[in-house]
A protein has these predicted regions:
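Amphipathic alpha-helical scaffolding segments comprising HEAT/armadillo-like alpha-solenoid repeats
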Residues: 9, 35-45, 69-84, 105-116, ...
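Substrate-recognition/specificity elements adjacent to catalytic centers across diverse enzyme folds
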Residues: 21-26, 30-32, 133, 138-177
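Charged, amphipathic alpha-helical stretches
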Residues: 1-77
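Core register positions within helices of long alpha-helical scaffolds
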Residues: 98-101, 130, 164, 238, ...
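Charged, low-complexity intrinsically disordered segments
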Residues: 149-153, 161, 166, 170-203, ...
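C-terminal structured domain segments
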Residues: 388-396, 404-447
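Generic helix N-cap/helix-start motif at coil->alpha-helix transitions
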Residues: 5-9, 16-23, 50-57, 86-97, ...
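N-terminal nucleotide-handling cores and adjacent loading/scaffold lobes of large enzymes
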Residues: 56-65, 82-83, 95-102
């Protein structure tokens, strides 16, 4: 899996990859062939930083509709030779989701492609989930034979079938197929086996047992670390349940590193909640300074942690970043300068895609730091993360007087529903594009309810929208 190559933000391709509203507006104004080429590149080479979190499918599907775009490129991608060897969901997931939205909008060619791919494609389960939401009963029943043929009548095949039934996001196709006398017995057995497997996992936990003490919890955490599965967070919860007052010296010693790395991480995560105002705990966090210690500090939010954050915020390491994030989330007006400085330094040093920016951008908006507007605008334009851009839009709504007449307008076409919601609440209707767009969002059955609620709050009998 390769990292996506993101084009410059001022290009049509770069705008579409980022999912910006200006991407749609520029595509509709560009030559159709150029717009379709950029759109197809985005759909076939997923540009998202985190494909499990960021949204693009509805955004691209709407643009296919506006451009009356053919689906030949998507078809070639789905049924190409790579599909025989690359079974990763990420390769075809975005294209299948786009087809799902197009099918909802009445594009029969998209529906037919989904059916074909569900019958023969490697990522058939994703296509089937899309069809479960959009196809009729007859269409779904026609897929029973090719889908079930994937699972041979062997012990291994039946186990795979039980897992597929158990893990399906949408149970509708499987329920329909179970109604058929041809498949009822086999699918009923698969469903029951899946339920039994789930019950069996719940009944055979591998974690703590009654009667465990502090040392047993530390040993469990150490065993997890040896197996490559850090368990210090659940171990800290166990520690809270089993620790007695007389165990405090042993826990403090473990937090200082006397019992190994896993025990130290477990003890620190326990102490930051058990003794949040104890300066000695913060000293232990600072002395450790590693990832578990920083994660433990991030769970603190009291006055002592804030006081220490004001001292640590200038550090160039992860503890300094955690201190800045805490001030952004919990600090007061007097901390605005520190948050602004951290925001500027992070953009300057790590660029507009740094994960550290999420908390700092939120903090700039929460504290209404007007001086942050220029750097927030830079983050908005340049970041490849649509989630971070949405946070920047919310922060700009609180800090930038020009937001309503500027970025808020293009945000009505953004790929993220939360960003469209912000735009629907703030975009100035003096712009001739705003009123028609609000009406379209209000009438679009694919639009999210929160966005439509925001639109309805703007469409009143007294308004001109």
């Amino acid at each position: 899996m390769f990292e996506p190559v993101i084009a410059p933000s001022g290009t049509l391709l770069g705008l579409l990859q980022r999912g910006r509203g200006d991407g749609t507006l520029h595509a509709l104004a560009a030559p159709r062939s150029e717009a379709l080429a950029a759109l197809n590149q985005c759909v076939l080479r997923d540009p998202r930083q985190d494909w499990q979190v960021e949204n693009r499918s509805l955004y691209y599907a709407r643009l296919y509709l506006d451009l009356d775009g053919p689906l030949g490129e998507i078809e070639a991608h789905l049924f190409g030779a790579d599909d025989l060897f690359d079974e990763e969901d990420h390769r075809t997931g975005l294209a299948l989701s786009v087809l799902g939205h197009l099918a909802s909008y009445g594009r029969d060619d998209a529906l037919m492609l989904l059916r074909r791919y569900a019958a023969s494609g490697a990522n058939w389960a994703w296509a089937l989930d899309e069809l479960a939401l959009r196809d009729d009963d007859a269409g779904l029943r026609s897929l029973a034979a090719p889908v079930l043929a994937r699972f041979p009548a062997t012990p291994e095949g039946e186990a795979r079938l039980a897992a597929a039934v158990r893990d399906a996001y949408e149970p509708r196709p499987w329920a329909l197929w179970e109604e058929s006398p041809l498949y009822a017995e086999r699918l009923r057995a698969a469903r029951q086996q899946g339920s039994f497997d789930r019950w069996q996992r719940q009944m055979t936990p591998s974690g703590p047992r009654p009667g465990w003490g502090v040392q047993a919890v530390f040993d469990w955490a150490a065993d997890g670390l040896r197996r490559g599965t850090p368990l210090h967070v659940p171990a800290a919860r166990c520690l809270a349940a089993v620790a007695a007052p007389e165990d405090r010296p042993a826990i403090l010693a473990a937090a200082a590193g006397a019992c190994g790395e896993a025990a130290r991480a477990t003890a620190l995560h326990h102490l930051v909640l058990a003794e949040p105002e104890n300066p000695a705990v913060l000293d232990l966090v600072e002395a450790a300074g590693d990832e578990p210690a920083v994660a433990a500090y991030e769970r603190m939010c009291g006055p002592a942690a804030l006081d220490r954050a004001r001292l640590w915020v200038h550090r160039p390491d992860a503890l300094g970043a955690a201190a800045a994030a805490l001030l952004a989330a919990r600090g007061g007006a007097d901390d605005a300068g520190l948050v602004l400085g951290a925001l500027r330094n992070t953009v300057r040093g790590a660029g507009p895609d740094s994960v550290r920016l999420f908390a700092l951008v939120d903090g700039a908006g929460r504290l209404s730091i007007g001086c942050a507007a220029p750097v927030l605008r830079h983050v908005y334009r340049e970041t490849a993360s649509s989630h971070l851009r949405g946070r920047a839009a919310r922060a700009l709504a609180a800090t930038d007087p020009t937001f309503a007449a500027g970025f808020a307008v293009e945000c009505l076409w953004d790929c993220e529903e939360t960003t469209r919601e912000v735009a629907a609440r703030h975009a100035e209707t003096a712009d001739a594009r705003v009123a028609p767009r609000l009406r379209r969002l209000a009438a679009d059955p694919a639009e999210e309810e929160d966005v439509q609620s925001a639109v309805r709050s703007r469409i009143t009998p007294e308004s001109a929208v």
